[in-house]
C-alpha cells in the first residue's frame, strides 16, 4: 500500500505533464453543450467564444467546446481537476487545427520573442555652398580736357609823328597829349609844357630873381 501511493502520484504527474490540452470529443452536440455550460460556469474564460470574442470563429459547437473545457482545465488542473466532463472531453498533446491560436497548453512554455529595434540611419544632407560671384569693378578713364590757351591780343601802338607848328613858346605841338605813345603818363594841368602861359610866368620869375639879387648887391656895397 505504501508503495502504490507514490507510484500513483508519479503516474498522475506524468499524465498531467504530457496532457497539454483538454479537448472535446466528436459526438453529440447536446453533450458538448453541457460541457461548455459546466466549464463556463466554473471559472473558464468564455468571453473568447462570444460573438465579439477572438475565438468565436469558427462558429461551431465543437470549437466553442474545445476553448471552454481547455480554459477550465488549464486553470483547475493544479487543484485536481480532470479532463473528462462526463466523457465529453479527453487530454491531448496537440491542439486542434481549427482553434490552435485560442488554446493554451499547460506544459508549453512559450519563448518570448525579443524584437530587434530598428535603428534608422539618419540622413545627413550635404550642405550646398554657393560660389560667390565677384564683380569686376569698372574703372572709368578720366577725360582730361585740353585747356585752351588764348593768345593775348597785343595791340600795336600807333605812334603819331605829327609835328605841329610851334606855339607861342617855341614848343612844337603834338597830336597826342601823352609823352609816351599808347600811355597816359604825360603831365596834365596848366603847368605842363603845353601851357600857353608858361613863357610869361617864367619871365616874371626871372625878373623877380634879378631884382632880389640887385637889392642884395646894393646892400653889400653900402
Swiss-Prot record:
The UniProt regions of compositional bias labelled Low complexity, in chain numbering, are 88-187
Region of interest (Disordered), residue spans: 88-199
Propeptide residues, chain positions: 198-222
| GO CC terms | mitochondrion; plasma membrane; plasmodesma; side of membrane
Q: How is it modified after translation?
A: Contains two additional disulfide bonds.
Principal localisation:
membrane
Disulfide-linked positions: 22-83
Q: Name one Pfam family in it.
A: X8
Q: What UniProt keywords apply to this chain's record, in alphabetical order?
A: Cell junction, Cell membrane, Disulfide bond, Glycoprotein, GPI-anchor, Lipoprotein, Membrane, Signal
Q: Does the keyword Metal-binding apply?
A: no
GO molecular-function terms, A-Z: (1->3)-beta-D-glucan binding; polysaccharide binding
Q: Write down the membrane topology.
A: Lipid-anchor; GPI-anchor
Could you confirm whether the keyword Ribonucleoprotein appears in this record?
A: no
Gene3D superfamilies hit by this protein: 1.20.58.1040
GPI-anchor amidated asparagine lipid sites: 197
Q: Which residues form the signal peptide?
A: 1-19
UniProt-annotated location(s): Cell membrane; Cell junction, Plasmodesma
**Record-given protein name:** PLASMODESMATA CALLOSE-BINDING PROTEIN 4
Amino acid at each position: 500500500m505504501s508503495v502504490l501511493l507514490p507510484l500513483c502520484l508519479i503516474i498522475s504527474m506524468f499524465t498531467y505533464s504530457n496532457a497539454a490540452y483538454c479537448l472535446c470529443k466528436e459526438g453529440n452536440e447536446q453533450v458538448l453543450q453541457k460541457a461548455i455550460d459546466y466549464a463556463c460556469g466554473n471559472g473558464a474564460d468564455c468571453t473568447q467564444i462570444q460573438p465579439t470574442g477572438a475565438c468565436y470563429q469558427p462558429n461551431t459547437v465543437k470549437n466553442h467546446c474545445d476553448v471552454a473545457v481547455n480554459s477550465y482545465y488549464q486553470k483547475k488542473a493544479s487543484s485536481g481537476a480532470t479532463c473528462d466532463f462526463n466523457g465529453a472531453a479527453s487530454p491531448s498533446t496537440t491542439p486542434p487545427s481549427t482553434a490552435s491560436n485560442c488554446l493554451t497548453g499547460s506544459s508549453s512554455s512559450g519563448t518570448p520573442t525579443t524584437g530587434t529595434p530598428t535603428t534608422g540611419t539618419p540622413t545627413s544632407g550635404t550642405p550646398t555652398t554657393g560660389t560667390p560671384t565677384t564683380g569686376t569693378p569698372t574703372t572709368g578713364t578720366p577725360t582730361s580736357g585740353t585747356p585752351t590757351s588764348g593768345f593775348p591780343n597785343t595791340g600795336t601802338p600807333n605812334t603819331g609823328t605829327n609835328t605841329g607848328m610851334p606855339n607861342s613858346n617855341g614848343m612844337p605841338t603834338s597830336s597826342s597829349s601823352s609823352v609816351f605813345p599808347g600811355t597816359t603818363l604825360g603831365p596834365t594841368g596848366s603847368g605842363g609844357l603845353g601851357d600857353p602861359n608858361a613863357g610869361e610866368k617864367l619871365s616874371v620869375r626871372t625878373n623877380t630873381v634879378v631884382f632880389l639879387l640887385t637889392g642884395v648887391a646894393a646892400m653889400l656895397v653900402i
